[in-house]
Amino acid sequence: MKTNLIPFIFLAIAIFACGSDVDDPKEEVIDKLDLRVTIPAGANSWVVNSTQQDETVVSDGGIHNWTSLTDVLRTYFKTSSSGELHVGFRIKSPEGTSKIKVTVGNDSKEVEISNKEYKIVEIGKFNISSSGYHYIEVQGLEKTGTYIGDINDILIGGPAVGSVTFVPTENSYFGRRGPSVHMSYKEPEGKDIQWYYNEVTVPEGEDAIGSFFMANGHAQGYFGMQVNSESERRILFSIWSAFNTDDPNQIPEDYKVLNLVNGSDVTVQDFGNEGSGKQSFKIFNWKAGTTYKFLLKGEPSVNNSTDYTAYFYAPEVGQWQLIASLRRPQTSTHLERLHSFLENFVPSTGNVSRKVKFGNQWVYTIDGV
């Protein structure tokens, strides 16, 4: 198979809100600007210069607890048209008076906020030269109180707004994580696949926190590498139980995935919340720009079960390392539905670009092909 380049550029829709509490916004009549589209701030905004601040400032209810003048917030959305864009905020200043700067493209406007109850504040008119993804950026310039402002919604309209795409509040968690990108492989017809090999290279600068570069996926599990934090990276191998539940404590004994053996410094534990089963991981500081190799074996075992064994090769180690061998009861099969994917599992980095190259894939069947 040829090398495939998967760009993962998440441009969503966002908005910012800030302050100390969340009140029901006051409805207002709009006279001057066309502000017919309401984008929920909490589902579509990020503090783009600080992941830690994002977790503090952005919530499902909007942007609150916004205190730092260094925070840069962006709300993403997609339009079907270009032209004049009207912008307004449903905003309040919890205490004192604040001045904010709002930027679209190369044009910025400064607005003073002093109202203590939510109201729609017109920001102004901007121009966007093309359809597609855009963002509205806001930064605090001055404040007399603790908080800069609370923003519940971003409102847009004007000729540039034909149809608009953004994340609704009820989809905030997955919307802020961004879309996952999946790639399937054509398998040899009528053959039982026992081994599945793949190589993974993450370009330098594309290894954002929250990335899961999943190399060897199949019908019953997945195997790849993650960026878990600024200081921790993992090689992860997981197998789902055949029992359908998100709570691993609900799995009957005869459906529980068994750990047959695991490699050195590998942690094996139950997992849930996305189906349930057994996961194994090795903390390993893999590097962007380096090619890593993943090898997975799947074959029927005793009493209607299947054994899955995962091996990982890092050039800096120079030898294959066993991650784990896991047995899935109530299933007798070989490897099937082979695929790879790239996803983000940290909502506060869902606006960040990430890429991966998968290459040199091959499979080996029980017939020796």
Where are the language model's segments positioned?
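Extracytoplasmic
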Residues: D24-N285, K293-V369
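Bacterial Sec-dependent N-terminal signal peptides
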Residues: T3, F8-I9, I13-R36
